[in-house]
């Protein structure tokens, strides 16, 4: 069965190596380097999800029950040193507990806890609103109260025992390590020395040892004793945590050897002081050890660019600072919250980000899709290390080779020049001289005529200067706009002026008066005509609607006709 498990592990490891190699090979690093894009070999990705908890109870003063009070004065002096170290820490913990309350739903029956609701409610008394730091501190207090009963039992047992190390487990299986680092020295050396060397000499040896222990205590836990916040534990503190044997971490933490190396290298094991007991001179630390999970088949590459030349012009390719490659995915990686070890990136979540399609195709080797910008200043990098050598743009830079500082002439048909230990031992770029790695090799394979994508503008924008320019432009535009409005009000808008309106009113009044005068004149003229020609004096030839036969009767017409007859 054991052989089968080992065989399965070997097969899975081989498949992981093959998959990682395939993922790495999908990025043509040699082709990209010809246009100044430098991509490293990449590191694996691990997600730091949950964590394991440990508690360290440090007994800082050994149990000295020597004859005739031998060594008592030295212990009192040692305690005064500890008071200066621990009293500010105790006061800060008291203040934190006064500001933050943690309500636990706990009922007890005959001293036995029946139920526990871990960190149910975290509120504030003095501050009103809980900040993220207060919530973190509240959770730490909740955890401390959960383990308080177990830690109290250990403290009690430590005062009654003369053992230097006690390793127990609490009710939830978390380890509590009790350390009495000076007890072995007292038991093995001080007590026998009293009968051989006398009390005074033994007391002096004890005083020297206490001073040395205080110095070692500050070395191992100095950063943790200086604050009530989380601080990384040193290797010395980890050795104390694991019985002075750092390799025992591999057997006590449920993780692999590479994960242990990563958390130690990146200082991700955190310790927080949660209790200070000045009566017994004991300090309790809560230790968080992250559990890492590796994401298979994923590599995070660090990418950068230097300028390159095409037809005598200097260009620059824009690429994301980090590239995440997966079997069927290629994108960017946001490593803001990640920590980097020698072999991996440790992130609290998946850092993958989408990038434009043109950048994806560019990173995959299609240089015609690479977004580029024209270089107009000297701030763009001109060289970089790659494969143990140097890749440099020697058209835009002054490059020398060898101890004789021989100038390097770059072919204008090539974007960059590759300098290694084989063709140039001492490399100089713009006055900076460096030696190439002897194991480096020439990376000029695949050099060919290159074409790149359309130019884009990526020059950084000074927002303050641009805002000032925009404000000045708006002020000038406002003045010009007022001038334009004034001109427009004078051109084509004559009927809106006050003088024009008054003139129109006067003309209309004059016209109205003339019309009235004409009507009156006509009326008087007609009336005078009627008064000068009454109806009985109308001449015969005057046109009238009355028949002329009426005039014949009235004017004696018939009488004249009768006489003629």
Swiss-Prot record:
Glycans are attached at residues 104, 245, 449. Residues 269-307 are annotated as: Leucine-zipper. It comes from the Viruses. GO terms for biological process: fusion of virus membrane with host plasma membrane; symbiont entry into host cell. Residues 522-565 are cytoplasmic. Residues 117-141 are annotated as: Fusion peptide. Residues 26-500 are extracellular. It is a single-pass type I membrane protein; Single-pass membrane protein. Residues 1-25 form the signal peptide. The keyword Secreted does not apply. The record marks 116-117 as: Cleavage. The cytoplasmic region mediates the interaction with HN and M proteins. Belongs to the paramyxoviruses fusion glycoprotein family. Class I viral fusion protein. Under the current model, the protein has at least 3 conformational states: pre-fusion native state, pre-hairpin intermediate state, and post-fusion hairpin state. During viral and plasma cell membrane fusion, the heptad repeat (HR) regions assume a trimer-of-hairpins structure, positioning the fusion peptide in close proximity to the C-terminal region of the ectodomain. The formation of this structure appears to drive apposition and subsequent fusion of viral and plasma cell membranes. Homotrimer of disulfide-linked F1-F2. Interacts with HN and M proteins. This is Fusion glycoprotein F0. It comes from Sendai virus (strain Fushimi). The lineage of its organism: Viruses, Riboviria, Orthornavirae, Negarnaviricota, Haploviricotina.
């Amino acid at each position: 069965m054991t052989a089968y498990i080992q065989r399965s592990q070997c097969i899975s490891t081989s498949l992981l190596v093959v998959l990682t190699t395939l993922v790495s090979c999908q990025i043509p690093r040699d082709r990209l380097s010809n246009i100044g894009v430098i991509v490293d070999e990449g590191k694996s990705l691990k997600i730091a999800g949950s964590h394991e908890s440990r508690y360290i109870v440090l007994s800082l003063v050994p149990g000295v029950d020597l004859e005739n009070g031998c060594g008592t004065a030295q212990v009192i002096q040692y305690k005064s040193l500890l008071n200066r170290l621990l009293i500010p820490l105790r006061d800060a913990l008291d203040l934190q507990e006064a500001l933050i309350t943690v309500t636990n739903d706990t009922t007890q029956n005959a001293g036995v806890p029946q139920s526990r609701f871990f960190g149910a409610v975290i509120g504030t008394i003095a501050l009103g609103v809980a900040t993220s730091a207060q919530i973190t501190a509240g959770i730490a207090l909740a955890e401390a109260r959960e383990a308080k009963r177990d830690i109290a039992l250990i403290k009690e047992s430590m005062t009654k025992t003369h053992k230097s190390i006690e390793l127990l487990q609490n009710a939830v299986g978390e380890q509590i390590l009790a350390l009495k680092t000076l007890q072995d020295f007292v038991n093995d050396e001080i007590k026998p020395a009293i009968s051989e060397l006398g009390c005074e000499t033994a007391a002096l040896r004890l005083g020297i040892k206490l001073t040395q222990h205080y110095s070692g205590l500050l070395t191992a836990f100095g950063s943790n004793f200086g604050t009530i916040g989380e601080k990384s534990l040193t290797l010395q503190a980890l050795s104390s945590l694991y019985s002075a044997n750092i390799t025992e971490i591999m057997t006590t933490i449920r993780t692999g050897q590479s994960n242990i190396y990563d958390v130690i290298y990146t200082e991700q094991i955190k310790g927080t002081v949660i209790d200070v007991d000045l009566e017994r001179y004991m300090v309790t630390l809560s230790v968080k050890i992250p559990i890492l999970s590796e994401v298979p088949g994923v590599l995070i590459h660090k990418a950068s660019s230097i300028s390159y030349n095409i037809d005598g012009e200097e260009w620059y390719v824009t690429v994301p600072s980090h590239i995440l490659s997966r079997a069927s995915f290629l994108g960017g990686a946001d490593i803001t919250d990640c920590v980097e070890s020698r072999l991996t990136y440790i992130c609290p979540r998946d850092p993958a980000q989408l990038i434009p399609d043109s950048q994806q195709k560019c990173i995959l080797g299609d240089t015609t899709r690479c977004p580029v910008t024209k270089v107009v200043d000297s701030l763009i990098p001109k060289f970089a290390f790659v494969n143990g050598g140097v890749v440099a743009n020697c058209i835009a830079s002054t490059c020398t080779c060898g101890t004789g500082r021989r100038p390097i002439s770059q072919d204008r048909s090539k974007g960059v020049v590759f300098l290694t230990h084989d063709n140039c031992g001492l490399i100089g770029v713009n006055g900076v001289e460096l030696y190439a790695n002897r194991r480096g090799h020439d990376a000029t394979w695949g050099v060919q005529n290159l074409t790149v994508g359309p130019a884009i503008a990526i020059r950084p924008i000074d927002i303050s200067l641009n805002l000032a320019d925009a404000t000045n432009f708006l002020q000038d535009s406002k003045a010009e706009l007022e001038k334009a409005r004034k001109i427009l009000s004078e051109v084509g808008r004559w009927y809106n002026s006050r003088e024009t309106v008054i003139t129109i009113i006067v003309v209309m009044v004059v016209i109205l008066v003339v019309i009235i005068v004409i009507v009156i004149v006509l009326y008087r003229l007609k009336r005078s005509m009627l008064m000068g020609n009454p109806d009985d004096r109308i001449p015969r030839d005057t046109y009238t609607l009355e028949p002329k036969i009426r005039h014949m009767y009235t004017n004696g017409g018939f009488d004249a006709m009768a006489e003629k007859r």
